[in-house]
């Protein structure tokens, strides 16, 4: 798309790959000018520290853009469009199976609309179709077994902290 807009080939490259191999090579290479990373705080801080070190043949300071494990919230007030709030929260929380830096991880809801909002979110989530995303399902698998185990551990933490869990886990 960038090339179609007139950008010369190779100026911007999207290069997904294993962080332990491809990612480390990019961070360490003396000709890398900018590193954009989305992931854990631990890995992001490591990338930042390594990018700050100069290497033989490096002629500029590397820049970093680091999006690291945040807690994205949505505020639902009594005067909001409740239908839009429900759709927005469900899309933000469950889009890409929650595997994105902007996944909504909490909703702060005014008492006056709390029960109605919760019920509508519950209904909307229960209507999500689980399956192969290539077949128009709302939710598919997470990226790997490690991600699944992390999600399951978060659920257990939430239960242990007395957090409200309103839906059953679907484990295929």
Residue ranges of predicted features:
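Accessible peptide chain termini
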Residues: 1, 169-172
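Phosphate/diphosphate-binding loops
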Residues: 37
């Amino acid at each position: 798309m960038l090339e179609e807009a007139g950008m010369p080939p190779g100026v911007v490259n999207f290069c997904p790959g294993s962080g332990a191999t491809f990612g480390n090579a990019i961070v360490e290479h003396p000709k890398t000018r900018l590193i954009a990373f989305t992931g854990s705080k631990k890995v992001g801080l490591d990338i930042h520290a390594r990018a700050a070190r100069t290497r033989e043949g490096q002629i500029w300071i590397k820049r970093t853009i680091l999006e690291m494990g945040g807690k994205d919230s949505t505020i639902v007030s009594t005067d909001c469009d409740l239908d839009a709030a429900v759709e927005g929260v469900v899309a933000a929380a469950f889009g890409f199976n929650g595997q994105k830096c902007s996944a909504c991880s909490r909703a702060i809801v005014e008492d006056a609309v709390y029960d109605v909002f919760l019920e509508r979110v519950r209904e909307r989530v229960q209507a999500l179709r689980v399956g192969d995303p290539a077949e128009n399902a709302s939710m598919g698998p997470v990226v790997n077994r490690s991600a699944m185990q992390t999600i399951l551990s978060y659920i257990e933490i939430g239960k242990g902290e007395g957090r409200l869990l309103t839906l059953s886990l679907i484990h295929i």
